[in-house]
Swiss-Prot record:
Transmembrane segments: 12-32, 42-62, 162-182, 197-217
The name this protein goes by in its record: Protease HtpX
Family listed: Belongs to the peptidase M48B family.
Positions contributing to Zn(2+) binding: H147, H151, E224
Requisite cofactors: Zn(2+)
Entry EC number(s): 3.4.24.-
Top-rank taxon: Bacteria
Protein species of origin: Pseudoalteromonas atlantica (strain T6c / ATCC BAA-1087)
Cofactor binding, per record: Binds 1 zinc ion per subunit.
Membrane topology: Multi-pass membrane protein
Active site: E148
PANTHER family: PROTEASE HTPX
Subcellular location: Cell inner membrane
Length: 290
């Protein structure tokens, strides 16, 4: 509940802050003097609705979509020792992290990987790949599970949604302002919106969206260090380091699907600025430094 309240409070605070900034600097008056009749408050509300709607809906259906896209087999009735061990381990770690028992699942994938998702820490899903179970020792798997449990306990899914929603709001808002200014000032359109508004708005939204995604990925990399530290506190630092080293040995395995990469423990080899995960060497180094 606290995170939801923070989510709503931040959304409102962002809208109020932008309104104050534009009022203090007389931005709307400046636009009016140049023939740009733009209701910034209405546009801001519109942008927030558009910006947060997709993020919130994605969060609420994240478990359903993860199960569907990865074809996750949820362990409701464990059929073998491995499945029973997985359930016991996650249950113990969830108690240590003071969260509700997540659903536990297995998905078929050659890459040793795992992910956690869900709209709150008491309604989450933790899933591991068959490649993880086949290529790691129990202590290493335990460390990976602890890493994912830490993501849930830290509320990373909600925080990512909050950040994405705020950035989406800025992207939609600024792209519309830029399009409107170009339409009125450069092309002298006096009523409605001409083609320039839509073209410039779309181009601006793409460019600003790319910049926003870099910020989201920066935070995602930061949260991986936190989850590693949390995993180490639950499963032991040496086990966490060993698990990351094992992942490093398997970096050439097939990567996770793009839509799930940000939730996995390892995202494979991607460009640094757009990577959801820090390099494994840096994560290992951070754990070794304590």
């Amino acid at each position: 509940m606290f995170r939801i309240l923070m989510f709503l409070a931040t959304n409102i605070a962002v809208m109020v802050l932008i309104s104050l900034v534009f009022s203090l600097f007389g931005f709307q008056g400046l636009l009016a003097q140049n023939g740009v009749d733009l209701d910034l408050q209405a546009l801001l509300v519109y942008s927030a609705v558009i910006g947060f709607s997709g993020s919130i809906i994605s969060l609420l259906i994240s478990k359903f979509m993860a199960k569907r896209s990865m074809n996750v087999h949820v362990l409701e009735h464990p059929e073998n020792d491995t499945e029973r061990w997985l359930l016991r381990t996650v249950e113990r770690q969830a108690e240590q992290a003071n969260i509700g028992m997540p659903e536990v699942g297995i998905f078929v994938h050659a890459s040793p990987n795992a992910f956690a998702t869900g709209w709150n820490k008491n309604n989450a899903l933790v899933a591991v790949s068959t490649g993880l179970l086949e290529n790691m020792t129990q202590s290493e798997v335990e460390a990976v599970l602890a890493h994912e449990i830490s993501h849930v306990a830290n509320g990373d899914m909600v925080t990512m949604t909050l950040i994405q929603g705020v950035l989406n709001t800025f992207v939609v808002f600024l792209s519309r302002v830029i399009g409107h200014v170009v339409d009125r000032v450069v092309f002298k359109v006096e009523r409605g919106h001409g083609p320039a508004f839509w073209i410039v708005s779309i181009i601006s939204q793409v460019i600003l969206g790319i910049l926003a995604s870099m910020i989201v990925m920066w935070f995602s990399r930061y949260r991986e260090f936190r989850a590693d530290a949390g995993g180490a506190s639950i499963a032991g630092r040496n086990n966490m380091i060993a698990a990351l080293k094992r992942l490093k040995q398997n970096q050439d395995a097939p990567p996770m699907p793009e839509e799930m990469a940000a939730f996995a423990i390892s995202a494979g080899k991607v460009q640094k600025l757009f990577s959801s995960h820090p390099p494994l060497d840096k994560r290992i180094e951070a754990l070794q430094k304590g």
